[in-house]
């Protein structure tokens, strides 16, 4: 079991190294365990932010647009997973970047909708790839 945990930790560390260098927040840690924990936390926070913005946007939409947003988000998740996959494993740096881009896009739509200028075509738009 310890070998499995060590292997997973090492793999996660290697996959997330680009993310850590991009943000620089995890460079201060000396052990690979601490760096892995730090990087995993950054990634999880970005994913949580995406889910929060998505939920907020759904909350201001009418039912027909909620359905369109759900369908578009499912298609985006497939895009993200396929575009960030390398040799059977997920490229966490890519996943982080793509998540942040989607979060920004959804946040822009949320601002528009809250301002009363919600444009249906942008909610359903598949603006990636």
Enumerate the language-model features and the residues they cover:
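Bacterial N-terminal signal peptides that target proteins for export
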Residues: 1-8, 12
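N-terminal signal peptide c-region/cleavage motif recognized by signal peptidases
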Residues: 15-19
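N-terminal alpha-helical modules
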Residues: 21-129
């Amino acid at each position: 079991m310890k070998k499995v945990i060590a292997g997973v930790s090492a793999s996660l560390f290697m996959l997330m190294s680009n993310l850590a260098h991009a943000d620089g927040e995890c460079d201060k840690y000396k052990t690979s365990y601490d760096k892995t924990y730090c990087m995993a936390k950054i990634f999880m926070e970005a994913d949580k932010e995406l889910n929060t913005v998505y939920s907020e946007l759904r909350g201001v939409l009418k039912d027909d647009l909620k359905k369109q947003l759900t369908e578009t988000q499912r298609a985006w998740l497939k895009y993200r997973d396929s575009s960030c996959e390398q040799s059977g494993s997920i490229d966490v740096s890519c996943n982080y970047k793509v998540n942040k881009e989607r979060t920004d896009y959804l946040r822009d739509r949320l601002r528009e909708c809250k301002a009363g200028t919600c444009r249906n075509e942008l909610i359903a738009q598949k603006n990636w790839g």
